[in-house]
């Protein structure tokens, strides 16, 4: 996609790379599907970078505005899917 991901310039380069991978995984869940463990592993790393619920909601809102994809909905779907199954929105 051709849009700018929500990034915090206080994050380290490694954290920014992780966040971009996480955003790409959310896109993949919507566009093609992604293995549950891959998405949940990136979500766990996302939560290490963004531990605050309020900040998570803010990032989700910003991401949804630029992409049309909801982080919250994708993660909720992943939690419902069995292990080793595809998460597809």
Curated annotation (Swiss-Prot):
InterPro entries: BH2638-like_sf, UPF0223. Pfam families: UPF0223. Disulfide bonds: none annotated. Belongs to the UPF0223 family. This is UPF0223 protein BC_3961. It comes from Bacillus cereus (strain ATCC 14579 / DSM 31 / CCUG 7414 / JCM 2152 / NBRC 15305 / NCIMB 9373 / NCTC 2599 / NRRL B-3711). The lineage of its organism: Bacteria, Bacillati, Bacillota, Bacilli, Bacillales.
